[in-house]
Amino acid sequence: MINDLVSDALTRIRNAGMRRLDVTTLVHSKSVEALANILVEKGYIESCNVVEDGVKKTINVVLKYSDNGKSVINEMKRISKPGRRVYKGKDEIKRFKNGYGTIIVSTSHGVLPNDKAYALGVGGEVMCTVW
């Protein structure tokens, strides 16, 4: 049984990128779906769609590669873990990697990238960083 679905999703995307796979499958949850939608919005992955097999749901993620065949994602790192939650205020999530990276934050307004969370003036639990 998987205890941390977000870490599992990040690991599956990272491993698929290293193997140069076109598509990978993630276990569905609302937070993983929101995370995948943010990655699509920010241009780190091509697309994601929810697939229902009866009761079980999964998310198919189409990965994105540069012209030389290298994955667009350089690094994905889980920050807040089940054993150690990490929370940041709005001023602490303003920029990451001089604007080249993204911090994904779980806020009271839902799961948001750092630029939208800063614009709304909210902080929250730092799920992961991507660049």
Curated annotation (Swiss-Prot):
An MF annotation (GO) of this entry: rRNA binding
InterPro entries: Ribosomal_uS8, Ribosomal_uS8_CS, Ribosomal_uS8_sf
One protein family per Pfam: Ribosomal_S8
Keyword Endoplasmic reticulum: no
This protein's GO CC annotations: ribonucleoprotein complex; ribosome
GO biological process: translation
Highest rank taxon of the organism: Bacteria
Keyword terms: Ribonucleoprotein, Ribosomal protein, RNA-binding, rRNA-binding
Coiled-coil annotated residue ranges, if any: none
Oligomer and partners: Part of the 30S ribosomal subunit. Contacts proteins S5 and S12.
Similarity section: Belongs to the universal ribosomal protein uS8 family.
Function, in words: One of the primary rRNA binding proteins, it binds directly to 16S rRNA central domain where it helps coordinate assembly of the platform of the 30S subunit.
The protein's name: Small ribosomal subunit protein uS8
Organism: Sulfurimonas denitrificans (strain ATCC 33889 / DSM 1251) (Thiomicrospira denitrificans (strain ATCC 33889 / DSM 1251))
Name of the gene this protein is made from: rpsH
